[in-house]
């Protein structure tokens, strides 16, 4: 089984989400996702300031085997992207939970209720 940290939330599309002290959300792809994709060679990240809805495709991760969309886990505004990850996408393979992709501020009235916990995500990928 892949590594699934208990302190994070997850999506069915294999993104991980960490809620920061200021209420913003930090998003990356899971260890299972990077393992399935193989050697990651390119990341296309969303534009800072972009408003997105939950489930929107906001970026792309490309590996030597495949390309996969990155989805927004919630509705909100992209407030930061990880330029270092875009410049060195292979780092996601070595530290999927340490390398974040983007940060998002929840839209008014938006919720994290549809995110799943580590136990549910672990069952999803087993």
UniProtKB/Swiss-Prot annotation:
Record carries keyword Disulfide bond: no
Q: Name one GO cellular component term.
A: glycine cleavage complex
Q: Name one GO biological process term.
A: glycine decarboxylation via glycine cleavage system
What keywords would UniProt list here?
Lipoyl
Domain Lipoyl-binding stretches = 24-105
What are the names of the required cofactors? (R)-lipoate
Note whether Zinc-finger occurs among the keywords: no
Q: Which domain of life is it from?
A: Bacteria
Instruction: Give residues where N6-lipoyllysine occurs.
Output: 65
Return the cofactor note field.
Answer: Binds 1 lipoyl cofactor covalently.
- Whom does it interact with, and what assembly results? The glycine cleavage system is composed of four proteins: P, T, L and H.
Similarity field: Belongs to the GcvH family.
Which HAMAP family does the record cross-reference, listed alphabetically?
GcvH
What does the UniProt record say this protein does? The glycine cleavage system catalyzes the degradation of glycine. The H protein shuttles the methylamine group of glycine from the P protein to the T protein.
Q: What is this protein called?
A: Glycine cleavage system H protein
